[in-house]
């Protein structure tokens, strides 16, 4: 843990975690910082001194790794379905990703488990005052990336994420019926 700050509501806070993954030769193969909002165990406990890590605004280009031997000389733009390349985009351009998707409870919970997020608020509808499961932000960001394929079909790999946010909560709707059985 490299940072901690209480939110203005006093009931939760943000925890920054630095994760490094090493292979069998002790070489770094994964290195990232993420932040998570968590509830305080005791909402009445005084706020700890805030420690907000100083993070780089972007991954420096020299840290971006393209796999050795990657070769796109035979790449077929017609088969990919879009002709657009790097030079076809302009700073500030808006791309309309026309596809949409409904976020499903089962997919959200599976993805949340795969990311090893065990926060009860994502699984137990009784854990929130409004009785709704909160959709895990990593799932929302993953869905956004998947939908971005339409408009960025020739983007072959993600070499870094410089940041990401979903500014508002996302929920699945629970449908119920009051219809009586009239057999």
Question: What annotation goes with each model-predicted range?
Answer:
Residues 10-18:
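Short aromatic-glycine-enriched beta-strand elements
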């Amino acid at each position: 843990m490299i940072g901690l700050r209480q939110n203005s509501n006093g009931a939760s806070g943000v925890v920054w975690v630095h994760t490094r993954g090493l292979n069998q030769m002790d070489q770094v193969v994964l290195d990232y910082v993420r932040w998570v909002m968590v509830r305080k165990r005791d909402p009445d406990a005084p706020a700890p001194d805030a420690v907000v890590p100083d993070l780089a605004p972007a991954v420096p280009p020299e840290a971006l790794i393209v796999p050795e031997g990657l070769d796109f000389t035979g790449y077929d733009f017609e088969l990919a379905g879009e002709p657009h390349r790097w030079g076809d985009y302009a700073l500030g351009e808006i791309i309309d990703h026309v596809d949409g998707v409904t976020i499903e409870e089962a997919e959200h919970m599976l993805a949340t488990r795969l990311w090893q997020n065990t926060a009860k608020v994502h699984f137990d509808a009784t854990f929130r005052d409004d009785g709704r499961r909160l959709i895990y932000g990593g799932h929302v960001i993953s869905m956004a990336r998947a939908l971005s394929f339409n408009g960025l079909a020739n983007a072959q790999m993600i070499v870094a994420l410089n940041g990401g946010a979903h500014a508002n909560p996302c929920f699945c709707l629970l449908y119920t019926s009051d219809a009586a059985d009239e057999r």
